[in-house]
């Protein structure tokens, strides 16, 4: 759509104004995103568009900014996930299987995969019994990465967390 508009404009001043306005709009859109996965897809699409017309080259820089911001968001999630895992394993212990999953997928993705495989597993209830719900994979996914799981799974997590009697923590998730 953008390329079609750009090709229709014969005046280069109007075309460059369109590109500048589009760059500004995209930069505003980028920093409103909190989902690194969607942001990377957006960056890919922006880059593809930037290669289709000579006047659209400034969009490549915007795509690079989007990619950098997505990486920054991912690293923030990994730092939080690492702390959740550290505190949770101090309380509950760590299995070899989970360590292997951490090495293979990274901290945040390991927590998401744990929740995808089983919501409310025995480790969840062990941490609940020790009043450490904030260190569960379910709590992490519900609070920080709801975009990484399906809506059905997210509803299941919210139902599970609503059965726990720790209202101050549950307000953080909702």
Q: Regions from the language model: what does each represent?
A:
Residues 1-27, 71-91:
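Short terminal alpha-helical segments
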Residues 24-25, 49, 117-122:
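A short structural micro-motif
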Residues 36-39, 52-65, 69-88:
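Contiguous, amphipathic alpha-helical segments that mediate oligomerization or scaffolding
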Residues 84-130:
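Amphipathic alpha-helical packing elements
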């Amino acid at each position: 759509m953008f390329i079609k508009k750009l090709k229709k404009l014969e005046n280069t001043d109007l075309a460059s104004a369109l590109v500048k306005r589009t760059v500004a709009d995209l930069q505003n859109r980028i920093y409103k995103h909190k989902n690194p996965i969607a942001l990377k897809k957006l960056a890919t699409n922006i880059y593809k568009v930037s290669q289709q017309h000579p006047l659209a080259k400034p969009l490549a820089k915007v795509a690079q900014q989007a990619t950098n911001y997505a990486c920054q968001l991912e690293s923030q999630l990994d730092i939080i996930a690492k702390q959740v895992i550290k505190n949770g394993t101090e309380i509950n212990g760590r299995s070899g299987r989970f360590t292997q999953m951490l090495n293979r997928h990274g901290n945040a993705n390991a927590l998401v995969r744990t929740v995808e495989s089983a919501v409310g597993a025995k480790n969840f209830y062990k941490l609940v019994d020790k009043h450490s719900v904030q260190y569960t994979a379910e709590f992490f996914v519900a609070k920080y990465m709801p975009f990484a799981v399906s809506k059905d799974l997210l509803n299941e997590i919210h139902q599970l967390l609503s059965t726990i009697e720790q209202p101050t923590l549950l307000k953080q998730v909702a």
